[in-house]
Amino acid sequence: MKKQYRIAVLPGDGIGPEVMKEAYKILKILQNYFSLHIEIKEFNIGGIALDKEGVALPKDTLLGCENSDAILFGSVGGKKWNNLPIEKRPERASLLPLRKHFNLFYNLRPAKLYSELRFLSPLRSKTXIKNGFDILCIRELTGGIYFGEPRGRLKKNNIEYAFDTEVYYDYEINRIAHVAFQLARTRKNKVCSIDKANVLNSSLLWREIVTKVSKNYPDVHLSHLYIDNATMQIIQNPNQFDILLCSNLFGDILSDECAIITGSIGMLPSASLNEKNFGLYEPAGGSAPDIAGKNIANPIAQILSLSMLVRYGMNLKKIANKIDQSVISVLKKGYRTFDISDDNNXFLKTNEMGDVIADALINGE
């Protein structure tokens, strides 16, 4: 008997509902053409949930996610809710509690530059990226300086000061290191661990444990870079990297650097997962309220987020590869949305891009 997959779909705010409609087209193809048994249930999240139910993360949404195998997330937030206290705004009051509730301790951020879109990259003149690049940034999500205690802001002798604490426990580093090495075996068998071990004790522990874990993966090549050198090396030659293994803070920095050198954040998916392989899959960009409702948003990041769900959440790598290949196929044919077009007078609308990707998937292109 074939497994039935349950997906909680959370379109959210801004362009979220628009691009999610295009992901639905791919989901229907998975059901009808690939004979996957997928149960889809949609729930409110973020600003729309605040407006309708008074909270950004309603109880029925959380329960729906608990009863699912994965979460397909759109985007949350917008100017409409910026007058609220920061802790009640959609971004803070929905996405962060979801991550905490499900203990989503690591984030996968692919940064892929397609050769057809090289003209978008700030590094387009570099010969080293003429064929594009493909980096996977693995970021620890639940430890480090964003969560360490003590933290605060105080005043002493009329002098104000603030402090945060970088804390990492050995088990936190150990588990994400295993994730990185296991994923490296599905790619190019290369891991570059990022730290500041020449200055920080937390980074020294990070390097020691990552090195120790690497002994279990003799087929995977491990290298180490200090964060300051890594930021330069990525700009100099991104092709030298495959997997970047990062702490929370360093991963926050490097994943955005990797994103911007691809030229369009509208192309980039992401996934946050826990030890049971339960994950939340979402575009790396935001809700983009300035273009919401105009049918010009790029749906590719949302579609590729679904592909990541199929790859990591369902463990159906061959089908995920076919979704990825469909995106590559339409790019090779010259199809573009506004954000990735070099001709502002010739680009596809959001729904049109979804249609051509769906057709490519059906036709096996």
From Swiss-Prot:
Catalyzes the oxidation of 3-carboxy-2-hydroxy-4-methylpentanoate (3-isopropylmalate) to 3-carboxy-4-methyl-2-oxopentanoate. The product decarboxylates to 4-methyl-2 oxopentanoate. Its EC number is 1.1.1.85. Its cofactor is Mg(2+); Mn(2+). Substrate binds at R99, R109, R139, D228. This is 3-isopropylmalate dehydrogenase. Belongs to the isocitrate and isopropylmalate dehydrogenases family. LeuB type 1 subfamily. SMART domains: Iso_dh. NAD(+) binds at residues 78-91, 286-298. It catalyses: (2R,3S)-3-isopropylmalate + NAD(+) = 4-methyl-2-oxopentanoate + CO2 + NADH.
